[in-house]
């Protein structure tokens, strides 16, 4: 009898454990809501290309509305990638501000839903492919290059010209004054010698009118 009782207790205990385990493993099935993925409208993607020392995280990309002058500023990633989404229809200017390299400017024309045309600012006839690839044109010199000394640079400098002209006047004015003084002295000497020269001239006989009448 005792063995049968133990067997019944063991069976009941095992049944209770199995039922509890089944309840724990069962999960209520909840209806999964399907999320509709919507792609952004009027998305402009671009990537910057520059030498390896370029720090794209310090750059600023400005998208300016030409009509309203509103600006949208983006910071590129470390790889130089940036994007603008949900752009309204209109004409925009795209500029990249950098202290390292110079980048070209672009004009962005949003015509409608996912209809974007990008053109260079200097050549409005050519349309660029998307996603846009922007390459640096040249490096911006941070320090001004030292210009070597040259005599022609002195001649072209207005300050140097004024100094040289002043020195020339200081040197030439005394010469001119001495020349003028010598000229005045010669004039005075000529005036003083003029009466003596007149006196040295021979006296020609004068013929009076009476002598002329007598001769006739």
Curated annotation (Swiss-Prot):
GO terms for cellular component: EMC complex. The chain crosses the membrane at residues 160-180. Keywords: Glycoprotein, Membrane, Signal, Transmembrane, Transmembrane helix. Residues 22-159 are extracellular. It holds the Pfam family EMC7_beta-sandw. InterPro entries: EMC7 (IPR039163), EMC7_beta_sandwich (IPR019008). Its main location: membrane. Residues 181-216 are cytoplasmic. Glycans are attached at residues 86, 123. It is found in: Membrane. Residues 1-21 form the signal peptide. It is a single-pass type I membrane protein. PANTHER family: ER MEMBRANE PROTEIN COMPLEX SUBUNIT 7 (PTHR13605:SF4). Belongs to the EMC7 family. This is ER membrane protein complex subunit 7 homolog. It comes from Dictyostelium discoideum.
């Amino acid at each position: 009898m005792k063995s049968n009782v133990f067997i019944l207790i063991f069976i009941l205990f095992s049944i209770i454990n199995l039922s509890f385990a089944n309840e724990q493993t069962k999960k209520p099935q909840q209806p999964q809501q399907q999320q509709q993925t919507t792609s952004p409208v009027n998305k402009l993607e671009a990537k910057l290309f520059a030498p390896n020392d370029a720090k794209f995280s310090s750059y600023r990309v400005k998208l300016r509305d030409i009509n309203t002058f509103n600006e949208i500023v983006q910071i590129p990633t470390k790889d130089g990638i940036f994007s603008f989404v949900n752009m309204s229809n209109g004409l925009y200017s795209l500029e990249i501000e950098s202290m390292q390299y110079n980048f070209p400017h672009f004009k962005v024309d949003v015509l409608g839903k996912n209809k974007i045309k990008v053109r260079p600012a200097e050549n409005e006839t050519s349309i660029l492919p998307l996603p846009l690839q922007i390459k640096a044109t040249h490096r911006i010199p941070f320090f001004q290059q030292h210009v070597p000394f040259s005599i022609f640079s002195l001649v072209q400098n207005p300050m140097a010209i004024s100094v040289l002209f002043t020195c020339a006047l200081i040197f030439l004015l005394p010469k001119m004054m001495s020349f003028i003084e010598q000229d005045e002295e010669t004039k005075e000497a000529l005036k003083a010698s003029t009466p003596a020269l007149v006196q040295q001239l021979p006296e020609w006989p004068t013929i009076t009118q009476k002598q002329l009448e007598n001769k006739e």
